[in-house]
Amino acid sequence: MDSFNPALPSIVESLDDIYKNFENNKKRYEELNETFSKIYNGDKPIFYFRAPGRVNLIGEHVDYSGYCVLPFALEQDTIVAVSFNKLNNDIINIHNCNEKYTPKSIDVSGGGDIEIDMKRHHWTNYVLAAWKGVSQAMEKGGKLKSVNLLYSGNVPMGAGVSSSSALVCVSTLAISYCNNLILNKEELAQLSIKSERYVGVESGGMDQSISFLAEQNTAKLIEFHPSLKTFDVQLPKGVSFVICNSLVDSLKVVTGATNYNLRVVECRLAAVLLAFHCGLSWEKVRRLRDVQYQGNFDLPQLIQLTEQHLSEKQTYTREEVATILDISVEQLVKTYFPSGITVQSEHFELYKRARHVFTETQRVYKFSEICKQQSNFNNNNNNNNNNSSNNTNIIQELGKLMNESHESCSKLFECSCSELDSLTKICRENGALGSRLTGAGWGGCVISLVPNSKVDSFLDAIDTHYYSKFVNPEKLKNIEKSSYSFFTTPCKGACIVSSTV
């Protein structure tokens, strides 16, 4: 891969080109080297790869309905050191620097046909998903080289900042690179999206796309249709985005049947019923965006149509949807429930889910447009007083959109929880202009918009009013505060790291 080709993942020779927190991350790579040598009998890594976690500013649970999102990459990442396994061509060895994650040596002679046991959740399933995806992507079914892998990650697990996707993405990058499969960033993102579905999560694509396509100092507006496109969004000056982990675990693959995957199905059923009531070719509809495209509707019209056709009877059973469409329940499930994915619910909330998706998408576009106007204003106006006044108004409007987003996530999409609702309320009461859950929800993190001058006092207040009151002290005992409560800026996407670290 060419480090000078912007379409391909870059090859980075110095860690300070990636990390602001250079010293701590240097120690991570040194530990990775030392541990690798111990595990693999003196063998040295020949490649290093890293892929970041992400935070979504706004646009929750809309990507799998075909709509745009606005994330940026975190500095926190998953890194992997790699060497070739010269002892056995059919075995890959998977280890982690954190002893909590037990190692596995896995026979991969089946290549792309390797089976992943989704009933037994193990962290190596994500690595196998990447292996399966890359193996299937190889031309003419070429056999992948077996490898020794050692991972190190500091993306908080179960926090809604894409630790699992970072693991899939870094594995996809590592395995493809080691097998001379040259893929650009978009292709790697698409392959990672496909691969992560092998572990039983119907991913919408945001997490993998930003992990590969992120750039320093800019958020990305990501559109998925008609093709994957990204647009830089410069964030306003004078404020910080602060991440606070509720410390309620949010594990999509574990709770998907009643949470994440259920919402995917509800959005699909909402789309097909809306298309049916609008007289469209509903048989071809799979996403809410398909209704917009086929009917040539704008978002306000879609919100009105949702009120008109879905609000009277908000909850449906499989049998009721099948009867309306004049198809069997078996055909409904086969067509609109993603294959290989379990959903545990007899009732499906369609009105609330559709209304959230359409209004949340409006907020994404408003948020990015406000940021664009602010950036253009600052570039064309040198009057400091005007700049200051304009920036204050901009920030307040962005905060309002974030608050509206959380309200919709909580009340319409019902992907919040009592701890997240309490935490966002505490954040607003202690200096945040806007605060919302970020990620899948049902636990995990909130993101808050905080004036730079108030960040330190804000973090202290959250410690006092949330962590000290709502979190078991035993849970905090072995965790550094900076790992669950911190401010962040947009960071670099996935890359290859020179073996000379």
Swiss-Prot record:
Binding site for alpha-D-galactose: R54, E60, H61, D63, D207, Y260
UniProt protein name: Galactokinase
Chain positions recorded as ATP binding sites: G158, G160, S162, S163, S250, K252
Domain of life: Eukaryota
Matches recorded under InterPro entries: Galactokinase (IPR000705), Galactokinase_CS (IPR019741), GalKase_N (IPR019539), GHMP_kinase_C_dom (IPR013750), GHMP_kinase_C_sf (IPR036554), GHMP_kinase_N_dom (IPR006204), Mevalonate/galactokinase (IPR006206), Ribosomal_Su5_D2-typ_SF (IPR020568)
Site residues by UniProt (Transition state stabilizer): R54
Pathway: Carbohydrate metabolism; galactose metabolism
EC number(s) given by UniProt: 2.7.1.6
Keyword set, alphabetical order: ATP-binding, Carbohydrate metabolism, Galactose metabolism, Kinase, Nucleotide-binding, Transferase
One CC-aspect GO term: cytosol
Catalytic activity: alpha-D-galactose + ATP = alpha-D-galactose 1-phosphate + ADP + H(+)
Pfam families: GalKase_gal_bdg, GHMP_kinases_C, GHMP_kinases_N
UniProt similarity note: Belongs to the GHMP kinase family. GalK subfamily.
